[in-house]
């Protein structure tokens, strides 16, 4: 799979067209020296960002909320202590929360694979259709988006790969279901890595998501996740962020409907039993 040409057509057998646009939910795990009064905050606009957070964490939330065509449906901030040795406790906390994309801007390199493994387990064993945007993570799974830019410069700041994962999550979450995030522009970025066309094709084939300068603007390459190894029942369609989002949405809606029907059936059965 190479970088896309100008005319891109996305097709997937078995997925019906979704007429309405949808926005995803991004959950960020943020570290603070001093825990605020609220350690979980739901944000819909930049006005909702708590002033008591550090400047760097406030910036992370603002970056995520920028989105793309739309802003994300919601951004959830989970605040943990900077002294936390790992993410075991917070992963237990968020396991049953409803969100689509996980981001940890301050993630240490030795924890990246742990988060990728957790995402795989949630998707495979618990049918929780969540995904993570992780820096330099060759997880080889549709649940992990492997963001790899090393040079990220705006007019005011230079960012690490991990620090810009929230911005990428916001772009993906703010992409309507009618289009893909491929070629989504990042107008604030004025400097980024430089690659040849062949290098970008190789990176795309390796399941790496990146942005590049096309001579006029900085924009995302092909909207893909880290899945490289395809098997029967999980083909190249599972490598595309948009199609996985559509499939995950379908699975989630079906599961919710099943739970609703099951609960209704239980209530009816209880009423009948009460009459006996």
PLM regions: where:
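A glycine- and small-residue-enriched flexible loop/hinge signal that marks low-structured segments
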Residues: 92-276
């Amino acid at each position: 799979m190479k970088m896309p040409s100008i005319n891109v057509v996305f097709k997937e057998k078995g997925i019906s067209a979704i007429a309405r646009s949808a926005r995803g939910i991004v959950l960020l795990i943020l570290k603070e020296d001093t825990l605020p009064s609220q350690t979980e905050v739901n944000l819909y606009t930049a006005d909702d960002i708590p002033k008591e957070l550090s400047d760097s964490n406030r910036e992370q939330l603002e970056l995520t909320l920028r989105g793309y065509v739309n802003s994300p449906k919601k951004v959830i901030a989970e605040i943990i202590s900077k002294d936390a040795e790992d993410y075991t406790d917070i992963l237990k906390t968020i396991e049953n929360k409803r969100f689509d994309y996980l981001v940890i801007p301050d993630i240490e390199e030795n924890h990246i694979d742990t988060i990728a493994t957790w995402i795989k387990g949630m998707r495979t064993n618990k049918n929780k259709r969540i995904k993570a945007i992780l820096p330099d993570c060759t997880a080889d799974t549709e649940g992990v988006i492997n963001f790899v830019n090393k040079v990220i410069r705006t007019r005011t700041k230079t960012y690490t790969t991990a620090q810009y994962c929230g911005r990428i999550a916001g772009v993906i979450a703010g992409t309507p279901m009618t289009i893909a995030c491929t070629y989504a522009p990042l107008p604030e970025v004025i400097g980024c890595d430089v690659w040849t066309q062949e290098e970008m094709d190789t990176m795309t084939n390796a399941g790496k998501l990146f942005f590049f300068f096309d001579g006029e603007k900085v924009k995302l390459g092909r909207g893909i996740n880290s899945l490289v190894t395809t098997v029967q029942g999980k083909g190249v369609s599972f490598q595309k962020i948009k199609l996985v989002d559509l499939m995950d949405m379908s699975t989630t809606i079906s599961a919710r409907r099943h739970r609703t029907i099951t609960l209704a059936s239980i209530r009816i059965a209880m009423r009948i039993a009460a009459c006996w």
